[in-house]
Amino acid sequence: MAYPELDAADFLQQLARRKEFKSLISPPVDQKELIRDLRAHFVQIGGPGCEKGGRAFFPCDPYASPFPSIKGLQLHNAQLFVQNFQNPNTPYSRLLLNWQTGTGKSIAAIAIARQFMNHYMNFIENAPWIFVVGFTRAIIQTEMLRRPELGFVSYKEVAELHRLLHIAKQSGSTTSVESRHLNGFVSTLKRRLTDRNRGGFFQFYGYKEFASKLFNITSKGEEKNFDVLSLFHRSDEAEDTLNENDISQFVQKISEAETNGLIRVNQKIMEQLRGGLLIADEIHNVYNIQERNNYGIALQYVLDAFPPHQAPRAVFMSATPVTGSVMEYVDLLNLLVPRHELPNGQPLQRQQLFDSSGHSVKWKKDALALVERLSTGRVSFLLDTNTNFYPERIFAGKMLSYKDEKLPYLHFIECPMSEYQLETLKQLGPDPKISSNAYSIYDMVFPNPKFSKQTEPKAYGLFNSTETPTALSMASTDWLLENGVQIIEPSRRAPFNVSGSFLSLQPPMHISGLAFYSGKYTQMMKDILSIIRQGRGKILIYHNRVRMSGVLILQEILQSNGILNEVSSPVGTTRCSICAAIRDDHTHSDHQFIPVRFTILHSEIEPAVRERSLALFNASSNLEGHQLRILIGSKVIVEGLNFQAVRYEMIMSLPLDIPRLIQVFGRVVRKNSHMELPPSERNVTIYLYVSTTPDGGPELAKYAQKLKEYILIQEGDKALRKHAIDGFTNQIKIDKPMLESLPLSPSITPANVGATVLNTFEAYGYGEQEVKTISNIIISLFMARPVWTYSELWKAVSTPKLIQGITIDNKLFSEDNFALALISLCYSKNQCKELWIQNRLCTIMHVPAKPEHLYVAAVLNHKKEPVLDIETYIRDFQPPMMHSIRITKYLEHSQTKEPFQVLYEKFQKDFQDEPMEQVLIHYPASFHYTMLEALIIDNLAGMGALVEVYKKFFIAFSKKDIQPFPDIFKIISHVPGDDNTLVGYATEDSVRLITSREDKTWHEIPLYMLNINVKRKENDIVIGYMESKGKALKFKIRPPIQVLKKNEITDIRMLNRGAVCETRGREEQQKIANQLGISLNLTKISAIKLCLLIRNNLLQKEMEARNQPNGMQDGIRWFYLFNDKMPSLVHTS
């Protein structure tokens, strides 16, 4: 066979010599030397000193990266390696991607799957399927649908997806027309992945769903309470060992159970997997001892049930493949190594690898050598700490000892328990064993109704999750008031929680505050306020639990100390996101008051709501945290979620084990997660809080025990990784023990790889891939420099790391492939490869010249003919501007079918002499939004009066309007124009700021960041608004919301929609007019004219209210305009 077998003595050596792998050894390059190369080739496009670099082709940005780059997704070397290793041309059946969090495991798996999909497309019939199984399957689907480079969607479809996402977000409703269009479009794309008639080859399952669909318990099995797990019998539950006869005969036992009518194996799934590909993400979840399930049994069955040549290939992924217990290595190896390649052709048993006595476990002699041998050729290991891409990880606090033994790796924020906590802990005895329902004792205790005053001698608190809710719920109202406790109304998703001043750092004089009940949470709050005062930066707070002392109480602690949730309006005690001062004391003149806000993610929140909150927290507009400063997350965030630009991570409780703690670290330390921040801020400070007592305490004891267990796991990790397939390319050398790994050196180094072997490179199409890579590099070089000789271009192409994102060894490129790439890009009468270079549509032309031929990026004219002109690159060239009408959510408020151009012409005709304010009530929202974007992007002439109206009503904003908000002004400061230039406009739920007129790109911020309160108090008389009726806009009125809430309105139709003014009784119209101060002789005025007077009066009052000091925050509401969100009205009678 072309590729070496895994049992070959020199397997890794043979693999490393093949060009498709050897070329992925990233050559070391000195940064100063690389800059010299950039300047020597005249391709430095940015960075300090680029203006003096000797190049004069295109404008140079001294603040940008100096390197040319290739647009779009580029697989990094580790991803390319596993794509080349695990594909239909190689004989390797199973692979574990043991990559640290945030390094692109999902993209690697998709790249592997794409190779198999291309292979299966050649099958005439019975093509196998690709199964993606795991809790994060939705994330993998999302990656497939947002990355056109992966080959599942086109660039045009991705652009349409972004467009639909934007307008659906603006609609503010999951049931709007725009949201339905988005869902339909996404469903169409997803069906392409899974529908064989549309070219789909994928099946997506969660672990539980896969296991339940594979093993169907029959009615007979249900009657006998049959459990598949019973076939995987535990002979000793305490030690969790397996009966070797049972496990070795598991497939046979399934067959017997099927024969006996207890179970039905899904043969359709089995046939789909025959010869297919199985991708299993976060594989440690399928055999975790602490969370017993049948997920691993299902995977083991489908891998073992087929003859070896028909079994599906498998890719497993995990940053921490063993978590709960070191004995999980047995389960991992049984999945990773085909049955016939295990010792004696039988599954591994735990007694083969471990000696155990009671709760003590240790590796047997030679067990680690067996792990090394079995994992050779089956593991890819990646630990990437390149600070060019990853934020620096900084631990706050100090290392601690427990019982005179120093705890390794971790630094802690030591939080001594309060006296009240210590008294409570005494109730558990001298050597307390903390049960699962008593975990709150690690964090805090609750006031105890048994004591009238918590400060009385011998008083102790509550902490048991069974007893605490009952005791507090039955407490008297007087006791609750005396102790500052409020019971939160129970709901289906939050059965019990409390709030109140007892959670405050500064409670009323007679109430014991947070410091009395929790040393840990008091320290957390002090650190949060200190961080806010220090400057910008988002904060992630993690707790493994939801109830009792988990994320729900953390939410209440933040709110009790002046930090708002996503939607609450600021009050006097709300803290500022810039200086942490409360609003009543905010006297800073150098910045506006911006409330500090948090959001929360846990399993009991609807997935759609979690996704929205995460998107807002991660948004580029929230880079500094002034929209959402803090995110509180439970264990739901441990896997599959990525957080962008988080500067501080506060860990309030230990997850189940140290490997999962590493997963929590990895949520915020991810590749490119901090690239939008300045270099000096690309770091994450981690606060690991632990409650302590004078003798250490139960929480510190828990960390000590888990760290001891983790050392054993690390020994297994080292053996697993010792002969990693890509050790010689990833070049991971660890000299001293660290949290992620014990000392480790690759068994093969780049220096001893040996001579390059080309047979498989040429046989399996890697030469074609090299031509494509070279083509992309050539294009990037022409974008930096428009004229090259052949020899100059070849030298630049073969210079390593000259192009950002290309880290393969360019020196191994074939010049023949370079020539092929160049020819394929050059213009001819039969071919014109179009390239966009500096906003010019160009093509590469071959120009015969002496002493050497030239290659020139020539501009194409309107006939797509190349133009070689000496002035091409100094002439200011602007492509024709294309104007489009944006159909947005606002069409749901306006059913008019008239296009913008018709309305625009009507507007120019009607408003030559009319008061310009009337335009706000004569045209639908779609007209206004298209007009606003035209005013901002195209700077329409002769529209000064309309601009002033938009500005008077705080609908449009100029640069001058944004200047009082320094952090927001940074977003638009680079946009050309003076202080009066329009740069943004307000929608129902955000302000859209232009960032590039040329690209028509926008940046959205919440309304409150410009001190716009969407919930201003309504006046006590009447509320006016406009509503679409066909092509007409009708003026409607309704009572103010505070009147509606008093149930004075009994007509439900009136309650929900208001009524057209002209349809109201004459008496009611006159009453409203009199209350508004309209002093004409109303008896002689028609109903139509009277309603016009009321409408204009309300509009005038609305403008005056908005223009009062702080009017957009506290002004009285009179009229809802096209961009105002109407409150939801609910009939309560």
Swiss-Prot record:
<dbReference type="InterPro" id="IPR001650">
    <property type="entry name" value="Helicase_C-like"/>
</dbReference>
<keyword id="KW-0946">Virion</keyword>
<comment type="similarity">
    <text>Belongs to the DEAD box helicase family. DEAH subfamily.</text>
</comment>
<dbReference type="GO" id="GO:0003724">
    <property type="term" value="F:RNA helicase activity"/>
</dbReference>
<keyword id="KW-0378">Hydrolase</keyword>
<dbReference type="GO" id="GO:0005524">
    <property type="term" value="F:ATP binding"/>
</dbReference>
<keyword id="KW-0426">Late protein</keyword>
<keyword id="KW-0805">Transcription regulation</keyword>
<feature type="domain" description="Helicase C-terminal">
    <location>
        <begin position="524"/>
        <end position="724"/>
    </location>
</feature>
<dbReference type="GO" id="GO:0016887">
    <property type="term" value="F:ATP hydrolysis activity"/>
</dbReference>
<feature type="domain" description="Helicase ATP-binding">
    <location>
        <begin position="52"/>
        <end position="352"/>
    </location>
</feature>
<keyword id="KW-0804">Transcription</keyword>
<protein>
    <recommendedName>
        <fullName>Early transcription factor large subunit homolog</fullName>
        <ecNumber>3.6.4.13</ecNumber>
    </recommendedName>
</protein>
<comment type="function">
    <text>Putative initation factor.</text>
</comment>
<dbReference type="GO" id="GO:0044423">
    <property type="term" value="C:virion component"/>
</dbReference>
<dbReference type="InterPro" id="IPR027417">
    <property type="entry name" value="P-loop_NTPase"/>
</dbReference>
<feature type="short sequence motif" description="DEAH box">
    <location>
        <begin position="281"/>
        <end position="284"/>
    </location>
</feature>
<feature type="binding site">
    <location>
        <begin position="99"/>
        <end position="106"/>
    </location>
    <ligand>
        <name>ATP</name>
    </ligand>
</feature>
<keyword id="KW-0067">ATP-binding</keyword>
<dbReference type="Pfam" id="PF00271">
    <property type="entry name" value="Helicase_C"/>
</dbReference>
<keyword id="KW-0547">Nucleotide-binding</keyword>
<keyword id="KW-0347">Helicase</keyword>
